[in-house]
């Protein structure tokens, strides 16, 4: 229960164009696998990655003075396959979508993600832009 004057904050990944790892993963699934794998319908994963729907949702639920900002972050990996492994084991919906692919599709998805991540090699590391966004507001 949030008291009057209390603050709420919600964070989600930024859009797939800016959150390169998420964008690469979902582009690879669409290109080499299937998003239709029998999971229950869910909202658009990136629905709240932009200011308007985020602040409107906060206002619609009774909050005031909504703000929205990007939180820059970079994931650093030593191996271009680390991002795929993290998504396959450290997420919920993306991992379930990956587990439901055929072995051939999974391999093609892994290779496509590796290729996308390889473009972000900096010396001995891969620096993958993975910004999030935070929407916040105040309970009247």
Predicted regions and their residues:
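Helix-to-beta-strand junctions that scaffold the AdoMet/dcAdoMet cofactor pocket
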Residues: 2-4
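Gly/Ser/Thr-rich helix-start
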Residues: 6-7, 91
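Conserved class I S-adenosyl-L-methionine
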Residues: 7-35
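A conserved pocket-lining segment of Rossmann-fold NAD(P)-dependent short-chain dehydrogenase/reductase
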Residues: 34-42
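Conserved Class I S-adenosyl-L-methionine
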Residues: 42-140
